[in-house]
């Protein structure tokens, strides 16, 4: 790394390539041919160098060099050269674009495992993940419902949460990848309180000095004093009261059908949602733009951030998009958003 120290102004951001059969290699290439990224950070792809070369060819950027390395110290961090921490594990003769496979699952999981190791060892300042496919990693023998759960296990983190962000709308989730029936059972006072605290800490990290937090209800109209359920009275309101006693500026339970409009309009800085779809739907209505004529996603923006970890982890807010894989038409906007947040968080 030419004597560059970890306390340099530009932080080292480790970016996983994602499933080799997905849009991950393409959008990684598209982001790293943008000089602005190199002006703001030192990006390092964790993936397969030969696959990245193919991705550069796909987008017509064969003139860019790929620097395959086995140690972060060997990165050059220079525009025009893409540094790849090369695991040499993606045989594109076996891995077919757009198809689920054990081989792609194995490769993509190894990228995540390695980027976490590099962050824990202090060799990089933040991690950004492209999507892996849950079916593919399970075929490879890794039984995780997503990145978040693996990050938590590997870093030995007990209190963590998924945050989604699009523009000024930021949403935390009490639960994520569980059934709706189970999600209702997971709405507990301690969990809701922990997320309020985590949300306040996150807002302060990104420069919001006095954040205003809103907590969503679980039931329609936040149950109207127990008419439509008891979770608000028994679990959510006690958590909010405890947070207020600790000096946190928090409202709720706010009815779920209006809370996100209020937050997007500027009334709140961050929202605590009770389950996966309650929080994801409003974010994706805003960030995902569908082109009816072309029958494709015109734009995909937003970022997924795991809070509570000892390391920084941001991610694209979409899946592997196998239907668009290796066609040269995938949007890199969400990956740019994720890198932007990683840079901002790594400077705090």
Give the ranges of each region predicted by the language model.
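Well-ordered beta-strand positions
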Residues: 164, 304-306
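N-terminal leader/targeting segments
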Residues: 1-2, 181
């Amino acid at each position: 790394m030419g004597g560059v120290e970890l306390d340099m102004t530009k932080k080292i951001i480790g970016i996983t390539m994602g499933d080799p059969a997905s849009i991950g290699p393409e959008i990684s290439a598209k982001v790293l041919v943008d000089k602005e990224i190199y002006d703001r950070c030192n990006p390092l792809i964790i993936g397969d160098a030969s696959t990245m070369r193919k991705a550069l060819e796909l987008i017509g950027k064969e003139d860019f060099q790929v620097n395959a390395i086995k140690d972060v110290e060997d990165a050059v961090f220079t525009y025009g050269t893409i540094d790849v921490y090369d695991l040499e594990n993606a045989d594109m003769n076996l891995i077919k674009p757009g198809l689920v496979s054990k081989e792609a699952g194995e490769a993509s999981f190894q990228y995540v495992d390695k980027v976490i190791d590099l962050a824990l060892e202090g060799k990089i300042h933040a991690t950004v993940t492209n999507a892996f496919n849950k079916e593919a990693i399970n075929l490879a023998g890794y039984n995780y419902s997503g990145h978040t759960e693996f990050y938590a296990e590997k870093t030995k983190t007990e209190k963590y949460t998924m945050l989604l962000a699009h523009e000024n709308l930021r949403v935390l989730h009490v639960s994520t990848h569980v059934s709706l029936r189970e999600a209702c059972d997971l709405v507990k006072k301690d969990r809701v309180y922990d997320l309020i605290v985590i949300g306040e800490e996150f807002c302060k990290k990104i420069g919001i000095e006095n954040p205003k937090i809103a907590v969503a209800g679980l039931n329609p109209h936040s149950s109207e004093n127990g008419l439509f359920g008891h979770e608000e009275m028994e679990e959510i309101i006690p958590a909010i009261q405890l947070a207020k006693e600790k000096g946190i500026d928090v409202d709720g339970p706010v009815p779920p059908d209006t809370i996100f409009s209020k937050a997007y309009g500027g009334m709140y800085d961050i929202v605590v949602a009770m389950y996966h779809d309650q929080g994801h739907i409003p974010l994706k209505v805003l960030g995902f733009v569908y082109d009816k004529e072309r029958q494709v996603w015109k734009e995909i923006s937003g970022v997924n951030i795991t809070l509570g970890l000892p390391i920084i982890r941001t991610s694209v807010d979409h899946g592997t998009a196998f239907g668009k894989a290796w066609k040269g038409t995938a949007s890199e906007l969400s990956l740019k958003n994720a890198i932007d947040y990683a840079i901002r968080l790594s400077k705090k």
